[in-house]
Regions:
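Conserved acid/base catalytic micro-environments in cytosolic active-site loops
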Residues: 1-287
Length: 287
């Protein structure tokens, strides 16, 4: 860890992947590494676990390729060469009843930066999916709470969504939303991975669209793959609003790019601008 700041200083554009053990200590070190500038992390193969080494090899190659492609295109701003058709802003807007956020690669750095300026001003529940193993999410929830100045914890089965709630999907469990007599509540399950992920954004987005209808704001931040694209489509169908991080400020423009290229996003913004836009939208402004 002590070498990371020096590495970043010597090679600011370097992509660093942290290999971590699936332990509490490993999770703490990994979250620190991400805060110090590591681009992503990968869990070390578990001794004796069937297929563990093969899974590790495949995931490592995928991450190297994704980060390498991003590094190669950063200076070219390739997003500008990909036509993005933004959704028109709605003529009439209602104040969202919940804020949904999804992130993967780059998310442990992007999420605190996105939420710190605005979280305390948002009364509605904030629900977050960050692709992480089960041993990592409790540590990340604590770090996120310290960064944003608002209580944040892992979601639990049966949680009722109330004002001021900030819930992080636990590792290895999908977080879904359902209506209940008290309003809306959380359901957790270990269903099949979606888009190779558990937790995944799509189950949250799709069930929240059914539970909240049009009163949703969905934000998709930096991440590899296309998790969140199908769910963003459901949110749009229900009348909700979707905004995404731009390529220039994303570590990997997979998830937000997939949503934007599908035509579901009404705004594609740099991270700082996206944060302020989300705040205005959560306050009920047309933005």
């Amino acid at each position: 860890l002590s070498a990371l700041p020096q590495l970043r200083k010597a090679a600011p554009d370097a992509r660093i992947i942290m290999a971590s053990t699936l332990t509490a200590a490993g999770a703490t070190q990994t979250v620190k590494a991400l805060a110090l500038g590591a681009s992503d992390f990968i869990a070390k193969p578990q001794a004796g676990a069937f297929g563990s080494v093969d899974t590790y090899r495949r995931e490592l190659i995928d991450k190297i390729v994704a980060l390498g492609e991003r590094a190669a295109t950063r200076s070219l701003l390739s997003a500008s060469s990909v036509p993005i058709k933004l959704r028109p802003k709605p003529m009439v807007t209602t104040q969202p009843a919940a804020l949904l956020i999804a992130a993967s690669t780059g998310g442990p750095t992007a999420l605190p930066a996105f939420l710190a300026p605005i979280a305390r001003r948002i009364e509605a529940p904030i629900l977050i999916v960050q692709h992480m193993p089960a041993s990592f999410t409790p540590v990340f929830a604590e770090k996120l709470e310290a960064a944003i100045g608002k209580h944040c914890r892992e979601a639990q089965e049966g949680d009722t969504l109330s004002s001021g709630t900030v819930l992080l999907a636990p590792g290895d469990k999908h977080m879904r939303i359902a209506r209940c007599p008290a309003g809306r509540m959380v359901h957790l399950d270990q269903g099949e991975p979606v888009n190779y992920c558990r937790p995944a954004a799509d189950p949250l987005f799709e069930t929240a669209a059914a539970a909240f209808g049009s009163r949703l704001l969905c934000v998709v931040l930096t991440g590899m793959g296309h998790d969140g694209r199908a769910g963003a489509g459901k949110i749009v169908e229900a009348g909700g609003r979707v905004i995404v991080q731009d390529e220039a400020t994303s570590v990997v423009w997979g998830m937000p790019g997939a949503v934007a290229q599908a035509g579901y996003a009404e705004a594609v913004k740099p991270l700082k601008e996206l944060s302020q836009l989300a705040l205005r939208m959560m306050m009920g402004e047309a933005a």
